[in-house]
């Protein structure tokens, strides 16, 4: 399924039904009086989250969303039926923005809903205008028009851990080995063109891990795959910086990644993370230990290493600890020691 994380849609809520102007006509009733009913209200346009969705693909070509109009009032004081609401399902993590990118709602919870466009009120029938001075009222009102607006649906992935690294750093390989995800793996840059989510199981717990497409220098300026996917990192509780162990200067790679995230958003600069040296099976044991020690001393961050199947358990254990520290109500929250697993 193609991953679509932003679409623009036009919303049209239902119009209210017109009020009715009529008079009671019944045998032996000479002055029946007004009996026109009110019109029904127009339907609303509602967005609701669905746990089974992970893309906005359904709205790529379905750009006009229109709710049902209210029915007009009828004689005998019968109110018109209200129009049905249009309920649109979106993935968890969807933001609803105005055309000027002002946030209207952030749908982060399962079954969370938001009324994006309100239907118009039904018009009044002539029966509602009857009073002691106007016993044969003929006036009525038309229904109000429903709201019309254009909004932007912006999806930001909800994940516990985000995998950050340069192209070909081994993010997809790591995700495929520790979770149920099957990302494309190749020996050329940018084999991952869209975020991929997998679920890793450790100690009877599940951790949602997102593989973010490779970041290059200038990504915050829209170079490479640009800022399109950097937004998905914002919702991750913690990050893993994956650095290719065969790089000559692994600290410069760490600095590049850290700077790009910081330039995109200051919130990412303070997000908890640890470092994972990948492709360690291509290096000698002593060289691996030296590089881990070097980057640990330079950054003060926990540094682990992994190969094709090496050291997955310790990496996942560290990831699980980061996630647990960010759970609401955890008394240890904010007391993370970056040098402890």
From Swiss-Prot:
Residues the record lists as binding GTP: 165-172, 190-194, 211-214, 278-281, 306-308
One Gene Ontology cellular component annotation held by this UniProt entry: cytoplasm
PROSITE patterns, sorted: G_OBG, OBG
Keywords: Cytoplasm, GTP-binding, Hydrolase, Magnesium, Metal-binding, Nucleotide-binding
Limits of the Obg domain: 1-158
Keyword GTP-binding attributed: yes
Molecular function GO labels: GTP binding; GTPase activity; magnesium ion binding
InterPro entries on file: G_OBG, GTP-bd, GTP-bd_Obg/CgtA, GTP1_OBG_dom, GTP1_OBG_dom_sf, OBG_GTPase, P-loop_NTPase
Pfam families per the UniProt record, alphabetical: GTP1_OBG, MMR_HSR1
Domain OBG-type G: 159-341
Location of the protein in the cell: Cytoplasm
Cofactor or coenzyme needed: Mg(2+)
Enzyme nomenclature, EC number: 3.6.5.-
Keyword Repeat: no
Binding residues annotated for Mg(2+), in chain numbering: 172, 192
UniProt GO BP: ribosome biogenesis
HAMAP family linked to this entry: GTPase_Obg
Family of this protein: Belongs to the TRAFAC class OBG-HflX-like GTPase superfamily. OBG GTPase family.
Complex and partners: Monomer.
PANTHER family, A to Z: DEVELOPMENTALLY REGULATED GTP-BINDING PROTEIN-RELATED, MITOCHONDRIAL RIBOSOME-ASSOCIATED GTPASE 2
Role according to the record: An essential GTPase which binds GTP, GDP and possibly (p)ppGpp with moderate affinity, with high nucleotide exchange rates and a fairly low GTP hydrolysis rate. Plays a role in control of the cell cycle, stress response, ribosome biogenesis and in those bacteria that undergo differentiation, in morphogenesis control.
NCBIfam families listed in its UniProt record: Obg_CgtA, PRK12299.1
Designated name of the protein: GTPase Obg
Organism: Neorickettsia sennetsu (strain ATCC VR-367 / Miyayama)
